[in-house]
């Protein structure tokens, strides 16, 4: 069977959930025995989101092969339970950069380089490359932005051309739109959807399926009206109601017949669907018996999407412990030693996530100090691990100005320092320690207890590391080195003795957590928080 292609576009407004729609379809097709892969096209000119502010873009999701990508790839991986690659996220910047590099090398033989065909061909190559690399039945591609955005036009033209190249029977266009409900009028308005589809058809794309985000159910009459004016069958108009939990969305879209429509359009000959595992998981999520409150002490807490994988991983850890996780968001700039007790006294665990720069550092250190001294379950991630080492050096070893050389280049005690291979790097984009690396765990540690493995593999995104010049002093003072690189050169995990759960890791465990396969560190952390809750 030739590879099939599904393209998911969006209209009316952004943030409609195209990514969740694509991920949900991927899950449904996988549950029908179809081999799938998903990719995201982002129309911005950045080569990748690695240097973008979290306030601009939300979380940067890192793949096994070290690509810094859009947060939607996190949704894709969590839903389809497969690891993606750098080819799964393509930006305008990446496309233009590759085309210009080819032009400089003379690969266009002196021809005039244009958007059509050179940019569009490069975009199409990225779609075909995923099909080739992954040996899949279906490639699902989400086009970022909304129809009508000038930045999206080369991508839309490219997916229009793909239909001509591979045949109409091998392509399905899904358009996600908004059907707003006007409370005063008491009716759903279909005109925005009609105009969005009109815009799409003007550039040569006729959607096969329209997924309508709505807060009210669409009647058959409303679906028929949308179908009539958008030139599709009424049953190809799918409602996507707001869900209490993201993981309900695949089941809701299945009940609307989305996967059946795609299988019919692409002549996939799918097996009967087996959603039993997913249904069981969703039912479990709806009936959690316990509750814990976790403080998330970060610098971007106003935008929860900046920590979306951490939030999801905490929830996954809760599912494994039959526990609902409530997050108490604490701005690291608002916490200090004098008010830590007041801000943290009602929580069952404290998590300090990753980040960059000096803003909020002292607040993170204050939260970690309180967690250590009050024996409150603590999980530090990336910068959170570095802050844990700094706090320990200051409070236990008495190195009052201990710091990271990132924060204070003049510190007398740079317990966190720039990695040697990072010292001569000038460009910021794509130059950190990125992607999957192995780690050897020490026995008789919390980390070894939860992983139950000597060698683990986790994803990294950092430039700074534990400074080995201080390893002897810090370990002799009671901080355990619980995990290192296999050559023991890099410290990856630290723990504190005589504490119920104090684990800080240099890597990002949240990036590998899945709802059906919660990450073991988060399972252990929430278990410790639950024990803390029950001991009150």
Swiss-Prot record:
Its EC number is 6.3.4.2. Keywords: ATP-binding, Glutamine amidotransferase, Ligase, Magnesium, Metal-binding, Nucleotide-binding, Pyrimidine biosynthesis. GO terms for biological process: 'de novo' CTP biosynthetic process; pyrimidine nucleobase biosynthetic process. Mg(2+) binds at residues 72, 142. InterPro entries: Class_I_gatase-like (IPR029062), CTP_synthase (IPR004468), CTP_synthase_N (IPR017456), GATASE (IPR017926), GATase1_CTP_Synthase (IPR033828), P-loop_NTPase (IPR027417). Allosterically activated by GTP, when glutamine is the substrate; GTP has no effect on the reaction when ammonia is the substrate. The allosteric effector GTP functions by stabilizing the protein conformation that binds the tetrahedral intermediate(s) formed during glutamine hydrolysis. Inhibited by the product CTP, via allosteric rather than competitive inhibition. Residues 293-535 form the Glutamine amidotransferase type-1 domain. Homotetramer. HAMAP family: PyrG. Catalyzes the ATP-dependent amination of UTP to CTP with either L-glutamine or ammonia as the source of nitrogen. Regulates intracellular CTP levels through interactions with the four ribonucleotide triphosphates. PANTHER family: CTP SYNTHASE, CTP SYNTHASE-RELATED. Belongs to the CTP synthase family. This is CTP synthase.
